[in-house]
From Swiss-Prot:
GO molecular function per UniProt: structural constituent of ribosome
Chain ranges passing through the membrane: none
Entry keyword set: Ribonucleoprotein, Ribosomal protein
One of the GO biological process terms: translation
Family: Belongs to the bacterial ribosomal protein bL28 family.
GO cellular component entries: cytosolic large ribosomal subunit
Name assigned to this protein: Large ribosomal subunit protein bL28
Source species of the chain: Leptothrix cholodnii (strain ATCC 51168 / LMG 8142 / SP-6)
Amino acid sequence: MARVCQVTGKGPMVGNNVSHANNKTKRRFLPNLHYRRFWLETENRWVRLRISNAALRLIDKVGIEQVVADLRARGEL
């Protein structure tokens, strides 16, 4: 699926643009996605993920090995 974080599952949200005159038109709030490469020491290879900024912080916190293990358990990698 496009514009979805591979780690957290964050996707686009729907909301409104609100003008000064309080007119409302529909808009999409897109997640802050980036393609990033991570080196897996255990497999001696790079893995390329499309992740949000929140997922990048999660990887900094728990480590890429744990995140990849969770992705494999869900069957997404």
